[in-house]
Amino acid sequence: MNTPSNITLSKDKKLLTVTFDDTDYPMTSEYLRVYSPSAEVQGHGPGQETLQLDKQDVTIQTLIPMGNYAIAIHYSDGHTTGIYSWTYLYKLGSKNHELWLNYSNRVKEKDSNKNYHKVQ
């Protein structure tokens, strides 16, 4: 199990860089927020995930160490229940492109399935 050697939050609080094995994994606050491991986002089982929308302006307010295994991240939108294990942060960092593409496609699919009704 890898433990990060460094965790850095940018001054604007929109970019968290986590270093594992001399490799930096920069992740935006939006990306981390929409992939929060909390039950509020992930649900309590497969298929219960809640698509997080309009999180592009969210910033990271606080990073809280959770023993030697994780950090809790508190966000500017009030979300405070995500505890990011080192394993989960490594997954988010190493699969950033793939996971962001998946999220973007789900948002596009949701937008294309909207029914717009003209109000008369």
Question: Model-derived features: where do they sit?
Answer:
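Motif-centric detector for short Cys/His coordination patterns
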Residues: 1-120
